[in-house]
C-alpha cells in the first residue's frame, strides 16, 4: 500500500477531515504533505506524527519518555525494515524477529496502542494477508498482535480482514 493511502487511513482513524494533499518524491516514493500554513512535510513518520498532533491524540506517541522513544524506534523500523522489502525471505526474517519481540507484549511500545502499532499494522497488512494458516501459526505472536490491532475501531477500515483460527492445528508449530 502506498504511503499516501496509509496516511489517508490514519487521518480517518484519527477523526481528521480529509483534504490533505499528498504527493510522493524520489525513486522510493517518499510521501510529502503540502500544508496550508507552512513548509511541506516529508516522510511517513514525520507526517504521521504531525497528523496525531493535529488530531490532539498525543497519547498515541507514548506517555513516558521511554514509550516515546520506543514509538520512534518502531516508526524507524517500519521505514527501514518493512518498506521496500518484498522477497519472501526478507518477509520471513522480519516476521521471525517481530514474533520474538512480541512474545511477552500486547503492543509494540508500552501498555496501550500507539502510532507504531497502527503504522506497522498498515505496513505488514500486505504480507499477513498472504500468509498460509501454517505460517500464521509459525508467527503466533505476530498473528495475535495483528488480529488485536485490526479489531480496533477505525483502524482496518476498507482493508481486508485477515482471518486467524482460534484453535491451533499443530501442537509444536514453533
Curated annotation (Swiss-Prot):
Residue ranges of the region described as N-terminal: 2-56
Cell location: Cytoplasm; Nucleus
BP GO terms, sorted: negative regulation of cell population proliferation; positive regulation of apoptotic process; positive regulation of DNA damage response, signal transduction by p53 class mediator; translation
Coiled coil: 153-169
Secreted recorded as keyword: no
Keywords per UniProt: Acetylation, Coiled coil, Cytoplasm, Nucleus, Protein biosynthesis
Positions carrying N-acetylalanine: 2
The protein's role, per its UniProt record: Positive modulator of ATM response to DNA damage.
Protein name per UniProt: Eukaryotic translation elongation factor 1 epsilon-1
Amino acid at each position: 500500500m502506498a504511503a499516501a493511502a496509509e496516511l489517508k487511513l490514519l487521518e480517518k482513524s484519527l477523526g481528521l477531515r480529509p483534504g490533505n494533499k499528498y504527493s510522493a518524491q524520489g525513486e522510493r516514493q517518499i510521501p510529502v504533505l503540502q500544508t496550508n500554513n507552512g513548509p511541506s512535510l516529508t516522510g511517513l513518520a514525520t507526517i504521521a506524527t504531525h497528523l496525531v498532533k493535529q488530531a490532539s491524540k498525543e497519547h498515541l506517541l507514548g506517555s513516558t519518555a521511554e514509550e516515546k522513544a520506543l514509538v520512534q524506534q518502531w516508526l524507524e523500523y517500519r521505514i527501514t525494515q518493512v518498506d521496500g522489502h518484498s522477497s519472501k525471505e526478507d518477509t520471513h526474517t522480519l516476521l521471525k524477529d517481530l514474533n520474538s519481540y512480541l512474545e511477552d507484549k500486547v503492543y509494540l511500545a508500552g501498555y496501550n496502542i500507539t502510532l507504531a502499532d497502527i503504522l506497522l499494522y498498515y505496513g505488514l497488512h500486505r504480507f499477513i494477508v498472504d500468509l498460509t494458516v501454517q505460517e500464521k501459526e509459525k508467527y503466533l505472536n505476530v498473528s495475535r498482535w495483528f488480529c488485536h490491532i485490526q479489531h480496533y475501531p477505525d483502524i482496518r477500515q476498507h482493508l481486508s480482514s485477515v482471518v486467524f483460527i482460534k484453535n491451533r492445528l499443530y501442537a509444536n508449530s514453533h
